[in-house]
């Protein structure tokens, strides 16, 4: 059932479980990239997609209440909070002499705090009446931060300040992370929303979007092995989504080729 005017089906996968799995996978991927740079994109990039899937799942739940601003807006808010938190997590250890290995955990903690504050602000003074807005903003901030930092770490080959600044910020890769991760978080439910929405189909598209983000980063990095593996995974997952969509559709109409002249 849908809440308000949103429209999502029954929940097949508990949100907190999806969130925990996405968070753990993305953090593991960052540490793999830090300790084994040669596998940064192959493993780190793949596992960073987990944060995108978890973020998309939370977007599905909160957006079903009817945000009034459209589903994409909350995806952009997620990545806005996430970018601030990820950068703080990277820069604070070098500024205060903390261990570099604390970076992913520190970024996650900051993201939770930022998300909670933003969630409270959406209640008062903004006045949104969505009952789960505070918890959802907190979760989206966390997933946004882990997705941003995960893909940037995979590209840069580590999460120390010098690696991230030179390998992801100065070259603009963090902007790519913002857009790729943002689309992966906001698009799945935005594409599947409606009276016939199913959790399985939306999550399948979320996985496909996360894998596409990984593929984009693999291409940008020119990592041939990661490109091939990501492309195979994405084609299989997106193909599964298309089959589900055709199977769930009431009717499928194939548009013929447009006439070349009147």
From Swiss-Prot:
Record flagged with keyword Transferase: yes
Pathway(s) it belongs to: One-carbon metabolism; methanogenesis from CO(2); methyl-coenzyme M from 5,10-methylene-5,6,7,8-tetrahydromethanopterin: step 2/2
Catalytic function, reaction form: 5-methyl-5,6,7,8-tetrahydromethanopterin + coenzyme M + 2 Na(+)(in) = 5,6,7,8-tetrahydromethanopterin + methyl-coenzyme M + 2 Na(+)(out)
Annotated InterPro entries: THM_MeTrfase_su_C (IPR005865)
Compartment(s) where it occurs, according to its Swiss-Prot or TrEMBL record: Cell membrane
A Gene Ontology biological process term: methanogenesis, from carbon dioxide
Tagged with keyword Oxidoreductase: no
Transmembrane segments: 35-57, 70-92, 97-119, 140-162, 172-194, 214-236
Membrane topology, record value: Multi-pass membrane protein
Cellular component GO terms, alphabetical: plasma membrane
Keywords: Cell membrane, Membrane, Methanogenesis, Methyltransferase, One-carbon metabolism, Transferase, Translocase, Transmembrane, Transmembrane helix
Enzyme class: translocase
One Pfam family this sequence matches: MtrC
Molecular function terms, GO-annotated: tetrahydromethanopterin S-methyltransferase activity
Enzyme Commission designation: 7.2.1.4
NCBIfam families with a match to the protein in the record: mtrC
Family: Belongs to the MtrC family.
Protein task: Part of a complex that catalyzes the formation of methyl-coenzyme M and tetrahydromethanopterin from coenzyme M and methyl-tetrahydromethanopterin. This is an energy-conserving, sodium-ion translocating step.
Subunit-level organization: The complex is composed of 8 subunits; MtrA, MtrB, MtrC, MtrD, MtrE, MtrF, MtrG and MtrH.
Official protein name in the record: Tetrahydromethanopterin S-methyltransferase subunit C
Species in which this protein is naturally found: Methanococcus maripaludis (strain DSM 14266 / JCM 13030 / NBRC 101832 / S2 / LL)
Gene transcribed to yield this protein: mtrC
């Amino acid at each position: 059932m849908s809440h308000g005017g949103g429209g999502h089906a029954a929940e097949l996968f508990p949100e907190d479980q999806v969130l925990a799995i996405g968070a753990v996978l993305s953090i593991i991927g960052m540490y793999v990239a830090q300790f084994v740079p040669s596998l940064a994109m192959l493993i780190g990039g793949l596992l960073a997609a987990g944060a995108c899937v978890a973020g998309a799942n939370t977007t599905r739940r909160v957006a079903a209440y009817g945000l009034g601003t459209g589903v994409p807006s909350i995806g952009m808010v997620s990545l806005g909070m996430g970018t601030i938190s990820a950068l703080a997590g990277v820069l604070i250890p070098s500024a205060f002499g903390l261990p570099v290995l604390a970076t992913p955990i520190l970024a996650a903690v900051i993201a939770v705090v930022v998300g909670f504050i933003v969630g409270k602000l959406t209640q008062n003074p903004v006045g949104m009446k969505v009952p789960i807005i505070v918890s959802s903003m907190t979760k989206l901030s966390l997933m946004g931060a882990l997705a941003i930092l995960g893909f940037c770490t995979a590209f840069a080959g580590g999460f120390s300040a010098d690696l991230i600044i030179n390998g992801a910020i100065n070259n603009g890769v963090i902007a790519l992370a913002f857009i790729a991760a943002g689309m992966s978080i906001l698009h799945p439910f935005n594409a599947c929303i409606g009276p016939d929405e199913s959790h399985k189909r939306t999550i399948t598209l979320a996985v496909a979007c996360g894998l596409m983000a990984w593929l984009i980063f693999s291409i940008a990095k020119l990592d041939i092995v990661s490109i091939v593996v990501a492309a195979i995974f994405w084609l299989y997952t997106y193909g599964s989504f298309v089959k589900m969509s055709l199977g769930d559709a009431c009717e499928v109409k194939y548009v013929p080729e447009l006439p070349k002249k009147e």
